[in-house]
């Protein structure tokens, strides 16, 4: 998204400004079904069987009973995979339900409630303040050199989708377009009118195989440096595909977008980066 240069030495074409809108629309206490009463945990809720957001339905019925003890089940209890393999489904389900049933009361100190995750907690009672629908728009102006033209990128994060924790998108260019999701990439050439779909190798692990991919590339980069084949900066560019500064910038842009969202403003990316990051680095 930061449009790093393809060749070392080229000037990066970075966004000129960005803005963001969004809020927590649905998962608020005011939207809690009246029939749920004062329940703060799914397992003690009178409408658990009818609620589509039941923790028991999500973790136990949808995942564990179908043989999946990995994400998201193992987030509740990291030992659940070993339990399922060694003791069977009944024991694993008993352990998982016990964890999901952990609850608090009105007498529980607020600090204690906030200090830990409650995986069986009512989704409308949670203290989560992450937007369930947010859009970020980044805008580039014409580049000073290299013929890099103006462009716009829009990122939409929404909770209400069949593709939970999956990414999909489209890139519209002057000569064609690219459409992708977590399993395939489709390219369309405007000149020929032809479309072609590619199915890359799917790796295991978290983030759609991204965790394994990053770890592999990091090991390759370290090996290249230790063996004297490349310098650290060269290895990082070749195997990781970005510099440390670009990593920091990509994370910083999230904070800039949040500032834009909260203040309902348009944020100048160069000025924000200078004021919030570079000036502070130089002052320490």
Segments from the language model and where they lie:
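Oxidoreductase and adenylate-handling cofactor-binding alpha/beta cores
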Residues: 1-26, 32-121, 136-146
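C-terminal helical cap and adjacent loop that interface with cofactors, partners, or active-site loops
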Residues: 120, 126-284
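Context-gated lysine
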Residues: 11, 29-32, 49, 56-57, ...
């Amino acid at each position: 998204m930061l449009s790093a240069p393809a060749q070392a030495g080229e000037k990066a074409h970075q966004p000129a400004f960005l803005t963001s809108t969004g809020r927590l629309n649905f998962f608020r206490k005011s939207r809690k079904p009246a029939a749920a009463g004062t329940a703060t945990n799914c397992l003690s809720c009178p409408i658990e069987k009818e609620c589509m957001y039941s923790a028991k339905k999500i973790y136990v019925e949808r995942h564990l009973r179908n043989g999946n003890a990995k994400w998201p089940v193992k987030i509740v209890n990291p030992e659940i995979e070993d339990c399922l393999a060694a003791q069977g489904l009944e024991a694993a389900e008993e352990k998982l339900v016990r964890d999901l049933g952990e609850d608090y009361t009105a007498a529980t100190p607020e600090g204690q409630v906030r200090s830990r995750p409650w995986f069986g907690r009512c989704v409308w009672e949670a203290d989560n303040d992450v937007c369930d629908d947010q859009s970020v728009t980044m805008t580039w102006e014409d580049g000073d050199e290299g013929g890099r033209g103006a462009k716009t990128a829009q990122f939409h994060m929404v909770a209400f989708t069949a593709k939970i924790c999956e990414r999909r998108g489209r890139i519209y260019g002057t000569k064609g377009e690219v459409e992708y999701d977590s399993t395939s990439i489709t390219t369309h050439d405007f000149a020929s009118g032809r479309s072609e779909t590619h199915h890359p190798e799917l790796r295991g692990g978290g983030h759609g195989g991204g965790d394994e991919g990053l770890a592999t590339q990091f090991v390759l980069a370290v090996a290249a440096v230790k063996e004297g084949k490349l310098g650290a900066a060269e290895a990082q560019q070749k195997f990781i595909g970005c510099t440390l500064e670009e990593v920091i910038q990509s994370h910083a842009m999230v904070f800039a977008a949040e500032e834009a969202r909260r203040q309902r403003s348009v944020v100048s990316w160069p000025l924000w980066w200078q004021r919030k990051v570079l000036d502070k680095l130089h002052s320490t």
